[in-house]
Regions:
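Extended amphipathic alpha-helical segments enriched in small hydrophobics
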Residues: 1-40
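Charged/polar, solvent-exposed surface patches and flexible loops
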Residues: 33-36, 40, 58, 65, ...
Length: 129
């Protein structure tokens, strides 16, 4: 029941924490995998392939968005105490959403990655490296 007892003892809170952990860990694992692949290719051939660069962009944006979603999940189920300025969740929510405002994590980056996945040239030269 909401509003009674310690949050960590509440099934709804436990479920949201598990969901948040899954979001972050899966996104982080994929990001580490594609970074390793691109790094290995760069060491071997001097450059990462277009497909590897598309994966790098997509994994980086996905990791950022997943982190924001995870914090939002926990913030939402934490209740009213998360709203106070002294709350660590309040700070985490502000920080993670500040990161999502960076051009590298903007939703438009999905368009760039999609172009590259489809074999089209990216519109932003920074993706070319």
């Amino acid at each position: 029941m909401v509003g009674t007892g310690v949050l960590r003892d509440q099934p709804f809170f436990q479920a949201r924490i598990a969901e948040a952990v899954a979001l972050v860990r899966s996104a982080r694992t994929w990001l580490h995998t594609v970074v390793h692949q691109a790094w290995t290719s760069t060491l071997t051939s001097g450059t990462a392939s277009v497909a590897e660069r598309a994966d790098l962009l997509l994994a980086a944006v996905h990791a950022t968005r997943s982190a924001a979603d995870a914090v939002q999940l926990v913030y939402t189920v934490a209740g009213g105490t998360a709203n106070y300025r002294h709350s660590a969740l309040q700070r985490a929510l502000r920080d993670v959403h500040a990161v999502t405002q960076h051009i590298g994590a903007a939703p438009q980056q999905y368009e760039e990655a999609g172009r590259m996945v489809l074999g089209l040239d990216p519109l932003q030269p920074i993706v070319l490296w």
